[in-house]
């Protein structure tokens, strides 16, 4: 089972083994990592049988796979972080789009209100002019 827990990208992987295919007569236990901290227990490399070339090769392969696994997990973590950044940018762009649409609607409403008010002002000016004319006619007839 693969864990979904994140491995820090800056966490070093320590792998120690001999690239010499000949088995040592006195292998050093310190040279073989017993634990890869980022791996689950069932994925940990088992210590090799030092008398078996095949066992050492399998162990080396397992260590290389563990290192590749660490690199893949690191890349996945970076990609997930990038995904979060892109989602945040997309959310921001959608919010700005909605804000722009709202501003367009508000502008259209204000433009219509302005047109209506100009028409009302024009009617008021016309009525005022008619009242002046009527007032002048009354003044002239009295």
UniProtKB/Swiss-Prot annotation:
Residue runs in coiled coils: none
Q: InterPro entries from the xrefs?
A: Map3k7cl (IPR042800)
Q: Kindly state the tissue distribution recorded for this protein.
A: Ubiquitous.
> Domain comment, in the record's words?
Contains a C-terminal domain similar to that of the C-terminal section of MAP3K7.
Protein name per Swiss-Prot or TrEMBL: MAP3K7 C-terminal-like protein
